[in-house]
Amino acid sequence: MLFQVRMDVHLPVSMPTDQANQIKSVEKAYSQELQRQGKWRHIWRITGQYSNISIFDVESNEELHTILQGLPLYPYMKIEVMALNRHPSSVRDDDS
């Protein structure tokens, strides 16, 4: 199942820089492992924002939910999820 996920990060201004950097470091390692596994297929930064658009390829809604809740930045995110389906007019074989 493919999902488009928009993640907007809102770290508290009061969070110490060292704590924020530690959370970001763990987040990066977690997200890169999911990318290597093929579950986090794409990630793009939204210009000028602390936000991204990502494409996940997972087995179920529950798996995506578990992955998102596992993100160290999850408590500081606003997340929007859209389920995706292959379009019948697509000329690509690898987009399902």
From Swiss-Prot:
Pfam families tied to this protein: MIase (PF02426)
Example GO molecular function: muconolactone delta-isomerase activity
EC number of this enzyme: 5.3.3.4
Principal EC category: isomerase
Membrane-spanning segments: none
Reaction catalysis annotation: (S)-muconolactone = (4,5-dihydro-5-oxofuran-2-yl)-acetate
Entry keyword set: Aromatic hydrocarbons catabolism, Isomerase
Protein's GO biological process: beta-ketoadipate pathway
Pathway: Aromatic compound metabolism; beta-ketoadipate pathway; 5-oxo-4,5-dihydro-2-furylacetate from catechol: step 3/3
Alphabetical list of InterPro entries matching this protein: Dimeric_a/b-barrel, MLI_dom, Muconolactone_d_Isoase
Keyword Isomerase: yes
Keyword Zinc-finger: no
Annotated family: Belongs to the muconolactone Delta-isomerase family.
Oligomeric and partner information: Homodecamer.
Name of this chain's protein: Muconolactone Delta-isomerase
Organism of provenance: Acinetobacter baylyi (strain ATCC 33305 / BD413 / ADP1)
